[in-house]
Amino acid sequence: MEDTQDTYSYDAPSIFNFSSFHEDHNADSWFDQVTNAENIPPDQRRLSETSVNTEQNSKVEPVQTTPSKDDVSNSATHVCDVKSQSKRSSRRMSKKHRQKLLVKMKDTHLEKETAPPEYPPCKKLKGSSSKGRHAPVIKSQSTSSHHSMTSPKPKAQLTMPSTPTVLKRRNVLVKAKNSEEQELEKMQELQKEMLENLKKNEHSMKVAITGAGQPVKTFIPVTKPVDFHFKTDDRLKRTANQPEGDGYKAVDFASELRKHPPSPVQVTKGGHTVPKPFNLSKGKRKHEEASDYVSTAEQVIAFYKRTPARYHLRSRQREMEGPSPVKMIKTKLTNPKTPLLQTKGRHRPVTCKSAAELEAEELEMINQYKFKAQELDTRILEGGPVLLKKPLVKEPTKAIGFDLEIEKRIQQREKKEEIEEETFTFHSRPCPSKMLTDVVGVPLKKLLPVTVPQSPAFALKNRVRIPAQEEKQEEMVPVIKATRMPHYGVPFKPKLVEQRQVDVCPFSFCDRDKERQLQKEKRLDELRKDEVPKFKAQPLPQFDNIRLPEKKVKMPTQQEPFDLEIEKRGASKLQRWQQQIQEELKQQKEMVVFKARPNTVVHQEPFVPKKENRSLTESLSGSIVQEGFELATAKRAKERQEFDKCLAETEAQKSLLEEEIRKRREEEEKEEISQLRQELVHKAKPIRKYRAVEVKASDVPLTVPRSPNFSDRFKC
């Protein structure tokens, strides 16, 4: 029963180092190893056991193998066969197998503790033609020569399942340093910084002593290769004593700004380029190990066997460590640098003009201004009145006759030849011979059809109605025309409706009324033709006295003289203009004539300054009696009191009004409540008394029955 049953067994380590308890971040990796060991098939386990025995006298060497196609196919089939086996064999293990497995796991634990730190493998060169994979081949010391003689090609081994390095997240364990070692390191760092500062100070002192010399070509420092430092490496957990990487230092941008030489004049220390070896092919990135193929069935079983992450206890390492240590900022010596004053090279634009410029501008303005003297008017010396020059009188506008359309029409009418009226002359015609033989103008009498006798249709029960044979009109059968078949090669394109914009046009009903009038006249003519015309002889005209109508002669339009408004306007404007000129001349003459005003100053009283009526005591002592005055604060206080009184009065009035409104509302509410109570109380109403119903007998006589006489046979 013990062999067949699947019991839970574990292998706890015999020795446990409590000092490295906080450093071991993969303490729970043992559970994953046990689950992986249980999932290994028996054939693979035997191979691993043999490899463990030969591990002591063996060396692992990376050999670049290029397996042939046959080997690859054989190995692939072998792996598939192994994985397709059932997993009951792994569950039903014997005691011997379990003991061997435990021994193997102990050995692996010891090897891991004593194993050196893993370094990343070298990158493959680009020029390497071999595409084979580096696989570690185990060679024993005793059988190495024999193996090389017998087997020219190494056999393909089964790849062991292992978690990739990315998922392991194992930190390189570094030995903890003592406090003395840490202090020594700090001392060395401080000494280095002091030496650097001394060198900088000496250099700055030399530059200050020498002063600004001739411009020298600036010395550009040689580019120094710095190793790459990825931020992803900092995400891994570090111990408290583990030093930070020296490849990359955090640089303060503000402090690095003034590191370049202040000016190209200063001489910098020259130096030869120091060649440093650098390998572009090497890198710190660890290559991910290619994971082996695992079938879905194995993945599902492993998932069910593995305990989920939510049931694992949280690591209390961070809680035990406490808060993160605060980094101390190291104080550095200040580097004295000479200020680069640029006052000499500064040029401000002068906006204010100097006195010389202002004087030059004034001279230019004076030279530009030229005085032009006008001719002397002799009338001023003569002493006569200075009159303005008369403006030139323009000729009045001459009226030009208009070409009116009425005159054109009159001329056209005169040109038309007078139409001579045709004189009526009577010509006798021969009498028709038909009038003597027959009646003329009377239509023939229409012959009515003979009446056909028919028996009377009495209303009898056995009467058989003869259906009237109605003449059936021949109905016009519509002709159906077949539409043409469409061509299948041409695609169907529907006819789009044209978007026509209807323009509103003026219309009238005159044409329609005319058409209706014509139709009406046609109908009347037809009716007249149907009527029998009566012959009425007209009397013969008298040919002795022929009276023609008098000829109406129209008188031509006679032209009359007419006055245009333009001529009147021109004459009135001239008159107004002359009047204005005369008035202006009068005003100018009056303005020129000098008229002296009367001297009123002589008759006025002279100005006498008033003396101050001060006493001698006031003038000597200097004491002056102050007049009464009123402060603005007192004035404002009075105004404030009045304002407060007005406010109090208005507030009192408001409060009175509010109380009155409140009382009214209360009274109205009381009245409404009382009315509601009265309405809610049910009061019984008395039964209404109506008049009694009196039944009266009808006075209408009874109907006398009579037989209906449907037929006319019994009538006399």
Curated annotation (Swiss-Prot):
Indicate where this protein is primarily found.
nucleus
Entry function: Spindle assembly factor. Required for normal assembly of mitotic spindles. Mediates the binding kif15 and aurka to spindle microtubules. Required for targeting kif15 to microtubule minus ends. Activates aurka by promoting its autophosphorylation and protects the phosphorylated residue against dephosphorylation.
The identity of this protein, by name, is Targeting protein for Xklp2-A
Instruction: Spell out the Basic residues composition-biased ranges.
Output: 85-103, 123-136
> Which organism encodes this protein?
Xenopus laevis
Q: Where is the composition biased (Polar residues)?
A: 49-77
Gene that produces this protein = tpx2-a
Consequence of mutating residue 204 to D?
Increases activation of aurka
Q: What processing steps or modifications follow its translation?
A: Phosphorylated during mitosis. Hyperphosphorylated upon assembly of microtubules.
